[in-house]
Amino acid sequence: MAASAKRKQEEKHLKMLRDMTGLPHNRKCFDCDQRGPTYVNMTVGSFVCTSCSGSLRGLNPPHRVKSISMTTFTQQEIEFLQKHGNEVCKQIWLGLFDDRSSAIPDFRDPQKVKEFLQEKYEKKRWYVPPEQAKVVASVHASISGSSASSTSSTPEVKPLKSLLGDSAPTLHLNKGTPSQSPVVGRSQGQQQEKKQFDLLSDLGSDIFAAPAPQSTATANFANFAHFNSHAAQNSANADFANFDAFGQSSGSSNFGGFPTASHSPFQPQTTGGSAASVNANFAHFDNFPKSSSADFGTFNTSQSHQTASAVSKVSTNKAGLQTADKYAALANLDNIFSAGQGGDQGSGFGTTGKAPVGSVVSVPSQSSASSDKYAALAELDSVFSSAATSSNAYTSTSNASSNVFGTVPVVASAQTQPASSSVPAPFGATPSTNPFVAAAGPSVASSTNPFQTNARGATAATFGTASMSMPTGFGTPAPYSLPTSFSGSFQQPAFPAQAAFPQQTAFSQQPNGAGFAAFGQTKPVVTPFGQVAAAGVSSNPFMTGAPTGQFPTGSSSTNPFL
């Protein structure tokens, strides 16, 4: 009967122990928080797991651990467990433990678990006496509760008016007029921006009209009338397309000529009379590179001054043309080509000397300022398109005075061109068209080009290489070769040290002159203005004689230099 009573008491204690194990804070191991504790630490009164029970036995002093299901508990042990449990043990042994500052070890590592248990029980690092445990626990609870409420709960959202108070000023949106200062600043900025874009305002205006006086550098934007007009060069560059400014550096007006320093223009001596013409300086070769002893024959200084004065009248109204139209200077060029075309006196390049020297050139006066801007271009076009009557722009059929380079001397003395005719041959006249050589002997076919030669008719060349081994203009014989592009004369000493233009009286001169022989072969038919000539006449002013039929005869080129 005593055994049954003891058995009933043990069953009652076991039931009470299971009830304590079912409490929330006793459902986990006190040391490692593992669910389902199976042992009871009777030393401290806590519920632990199987692994922690073995560690607790290895401490110094070892803890007394009992199994919940395999042992029996006395009434005193049950009462001790009821007074303690995991919650009370936590307040005593982990009273000073801070979860945020103290590191919880990895309980999967047995060594770390053992070290943690030694700190906890042997060293009593976080130990709090039982009489103070409840007070410390309550303080920690209040601190943790306040911190938890401050961190976990979101603060209440309050309106802005509650923060500012009733005295806060009212905020009006889109109801008031904006201040005037931004408007003023914007208008000023627009004005400045407009000024910056004023440089494009002249694009729609006349580019040849005089612009309004402005002080900024953008006033002459896209104004081609003032392309070269600088303050210090108004006298030199005021006339647009004024071809008179080509040779003004040394005081002589040479169209296409080089300014001479100490030599007079290329003028052979004449027997008398006015030898100057309108374009005396056209194709002016006086500044050709030459040595100190090689001069182009004997020069006449008085005639050179007459020639310079005759052509210099073209630029006499240069100061007046500065205020005139920019293309008025083309009228000067037109007058050069078309002067004297109405009578029997020749045209620009072959004009005879019946009229006085100064009267040939018709210089535009101040009235050209009010003339049509493009009248000069129209007149220039009429020169090239008009039919040749008694003369054309390059030749003259007159029998009077002299050519552009002066008359050929009658006496066959030491001149640049030995004369073979008693009648002076004009520049481009029918007997001979070479400005440097008079006609001698029968001509194969007359050419109207001053720099043109006939086919197979050349016996001596003035400047280039002659075929048939005839002596050239500078006295140096050349081997027989058809004159091709830049062959012949450039292989010889172009300017020997002996006297230039030696006498070649033993040879008859070339009838029409082989000027510029080394520039290629002839084109047989076309004259400078499209007039078909004889079959043996070359149309290239810079080619020497060659057999005809090399090029088609039906060419209609109007280029005077092809």
Swiss-Prot record:
The keyword Cytoplasm does not apply. The modification Phosphothreonine is found at T177. It comes from the Eukaryota. The modification Phosphoserine is found at S167, S181, S362. It is found in: Nucleus; Cytoplasmic vesicle. It holds the Pfam family ArfGap. Its main location: nucleus. SUPFAM superfamilies: ArfGap/RecO-like zinc finger. Interacts with EPS15R and EPS15. Interacts with FCHO1. Contains FG repeats. The FG repeat region is required for acting as a cofactor of HIV-1 Rev. This is Arf-GAP domain and FG repeat-containing protein 1.
